[in-house]
From Swiss-Prot:
Species, as recorded: Arabidopsis thaliana
A single Gene Ontology CC term: endoplasmic reticulum membrane
Sorted UniProt keywords: Endoplasmic reticulum, Glycoprotein, Glycosyltransferase, Kinase, Membrane, Transferase, Transmembrane, Transmembrane helix
Protein name: Alpha-1,2-mannosyltransferase ALG9
InterPro entries, per database record: GPI_mannosylTrfase
Residues carrying sugar: N473
UniProt GO MF annotations: alpha-1,2-mannosyltransferase activity; dol-P-Man:Man(6)GlcNAc(2)-PP-Dol alpha-1,2-mannosyltransferase activity; dol-P-Man:Man(8)GlcNAc(2)-PP-Dol alpha-1,2-mannosyltransferase activity; GDP-Man:Man3GlcNAc2-PP-Dol alpha-1,2-mannosyltransferase activity; kinase activity
Function: Mannosyltransferase that operates in the biosynthetic pathway of dolichol-linked oligosaccharides, the glycan precursors employed in protein asparagine (N)-glycosylation. The assembly of dolichol-linked oligosaccharides begins on the cytosolic side of the endoplasmic reticulum membrane and finishes in its lumen. The sequential addition of sugars to dolichol pyrophosphate produces dolichol-linked oligosaccharides containing fourteen sugars, including two GlcNAcs, nine mannoses and three glucoses.
Segments of this protein annotated with the region Disordered: 1-37
Subcellular location: Endoplasmic reticulum membrane
Protein origin, superkingdom: Eukaryota
């Protein structure tokens, strides 16, 4: 029988060349990660970013200074009152005005109440327990954002982002600050991450929480995420937003009634006062249009500059990223422009967009080589190769400058917290002791640092003519009181200062090189029980005080003395 074998022809080179596309290929033609993600590794795992963020948030919680007296008097003090039935009240918490939400304070009681049971009279530990709680919330929200970035756009942009979220000075300090703007920052991170995960209903719900429970004015920063989510999944996103809004406004209304003892909404009161009621924020200081640009550079150095460039290079890199990343980053520009137009400016007002600055800068750093790539060439130029290796160098410079800035602030301005901690070692003064504070009232670190043997903290007149906080008046009703000495014009009350300084047992002073005498200079009346250096901002050159450079920082700057004094027994 004849066997017929069929031999298959070996493919020729010309066959393969003819079947392939004639169009040249370059790396810029690769589909972006937004078209399906990395099938091999699925992006970063949850564990490592979370651990890194938790570690840095722990460091922030334990070493962060208090940057603003508003944090103390409008948030730490009401929490102290809820926990211990003593603390200072500002005019915003007067029942007559009711501008502050107790629901936001109660959220922090979730950590403060168990800590007060566990640590008893050690209120300083309760303070740091609340800070650790804030750090944990920040770490969780930032982890969601980082993992979402990695799964949608790749590990590199996510790695850059987590490094800057951990170490940039702005994020380091804002992450554990007890402020509504910090809470809105957590919500911005979480809602942005959920949007990238395509969890649109959850993104809208978190946005509502950030606005109502956190800072109502931050609604402008959440608009891009909310609008994009509604476009993508209108029904689910709308229902989630509506239900969350109704629920939180209802709960807030009930909580406000419980504490203010009248039907009122602190959320609406705050908006009406500032938007419709002619809120006179200029009474508390005004700044120029470039304030936030300078502030952004101080807190993020070159990261801030790179972040601002994202919109400029987006036309070059838009094939790599889908529209979702532009939506996530856009609140940075909207918020910065809007806040720069307001006369009253505070550093904390920029907190909500801090994570977006890191994301934007990460995208720019990742794509620096793309700016130098030849469009139709498949070969990589020397300049592209060099810029690839420059990316970690740029990131390293940002992180080193950030660490230097963080270290400068902690070493320069941590004295108030540390000096007040030492008061607990002088309980031999006995119950009923009075702690007096003059011009340093705005650096008062909160009643959590005042030992139980001190019965009163009193302000003494050092020339300040604005309205100071008063202790919550339990006789008039505590949180429901409308004391007559409060006003919304920042006008000093005759009752706010202690008349007889002879009743002071302890005195807190900042002694700087100025041509006048300090009360603590009278050594026959006062003895120093704690003295720590404090950076003299006015006499220290900006180029040396802003960033910590070993040896030079100590030599070129001028320091005063932050002093706790005790009355000499007669």
């Amino acid at each position: 029988m004849d066997l017929t074998t069929t031999r298959q022809r070996r493919p020729l080179i010309s066959d393969s060349s003819s079947s392939s596309s004639t169009k040249s290929y370059s790396k810029t033609d690769k589909p972006g990660r937004s078209n399906g993600g990395d099938a091999e590794d699925g992006g970063l795992r949850w564990f490592l970013p979370f651990i890194a963020l938790c570690y840095l948030r722990y460091m922030s919680a334990t070493s962060n200074i208090i940057h603003d007296c508003d944090e103390v008097f409008n948030y730490w003090e009401p929490l102290h009152y809820i926990l211990y039935k003593s603390g200072f009240q500002t005019w915003e918490y007067s029942s007559n005005f009711a501008l502050r939400s107790y629901l936001y304070i109660l959220f922090h009681e979730l950590a403060g109440r168990p800590a007060s049971w566990w640590f008893g009279d050690d209120k300083v530990r309760v303070f740091y327990a609340v800070r650790l709680f804030l750090g944990l919330v920040s770490a969780v929200s930032d982890t969601v954002l980082v993992v979402a970035l990695s799964r949608k756009y790749g590990k590199r942009i996510a790695t850059y982002a987590v490094a800057m979220l951990c170490l940039t000075s702005g994020c380091f300090f804002a992450s554990t600050s007890f402020l509504p703007s910090s809470f809105s920052m957590y919500a911005i991170s979480l809602s942005s991450g959920l949007l990238l995960f395509e969890k649109y209903a959850m993104a809208v719900a978190v946005s509502v929480v950030g606005v109502i429970l956190g800072w109502p004015f931050s609604i402008l920063a959440f608009l891009p995420v909310v609008i994009y989510s509604l476009v993508k999944r209108f029904k689910q996103a709308f229902i989630a937003g509506a239900v969350t809004t109704i629920f939180l406004l209802g709960v807030s209304l009930l909580v406000d009634y419980y504490y203010y003892k009248r039907w009122t909404s602190s959320v609406l009161n705050l908006l009406i006062y500032n938007v419709l009621g002619g809120g006179e924020s200029h009474l508390y200081g005004t700044e120029g249009a470039l304030f936030y640009i300078r502030n952004g550079f101080n807190n993020f150095n070159f990261c801030f500059i790179l972040a601002m460039l994202f919109v400029a290079i987006y036309p070059v890199i838009r094939r790599k990223y889908d529209r979702a990343l532009l939506v996530v980053i856009s609140p940075m520009y909207i918020w910065l422009a809007f806040m720069s137009l307001q006369p009253h400016k505070e550093e904390r007002f920029l907190y909500p967009i801090y994570p977006l600055i890191c994301v934007s800068a990460s995208a720019v750093i990742e794509n620096i080589p793309e700016l130098f790539r030849e469009k139709y060439s498949s070969r990589e130029s020397l300049l592209v190769t060099i810029t690839k290796y420059m990316r970690p160098v740029i990131l390293g410079c940002i992180l080193c400058a950030s660490h230097s800035r963080t270290f400068a602030l902690i070493n320069g301005y941590s004295a108030p917290l540390e000096v007040y901690k030492l008061l607990e070692h002088h309980d031999d003064a006995g119950p009923g002791s009075v702690l007096c504070v003059g011009s340093e009232w705005h650096r008062y670190p909160s009643s959590f640092f005042v030992p139980h043997y001190i019965s009163e903290v009193r302000w003494i007149d050092d020339g300040f003519r604005g309205l100071l906080p008063f202790p919550f008046n339990n006789t008039l009703g505590g949180t429901s009181a409308s004391p007559p000495y409060f006003n919304n014009k920042n006008q000093a009350s005759e009752e706010q200062y202690l008349k007889n300084i002879e009743t002071c047992t302890f005195l807190i002073e900042l002694q700087l090189s100025r041509p006048y005498q300090y009360r603590g200079s009278d050594l026959s009346t006062w003895e120093a029980i704690a003295v720590l250096p404090y950076l003299d901002r006015e006499l220290s050159p900006a180029k040396y005080r802003s960033f910590f450079i070993p040896h030079m920082w100590q030599e070129k700057n001028v320091f005063g003395k932050y002093v706790a004094l005790r009355r000499v027994p007669k």
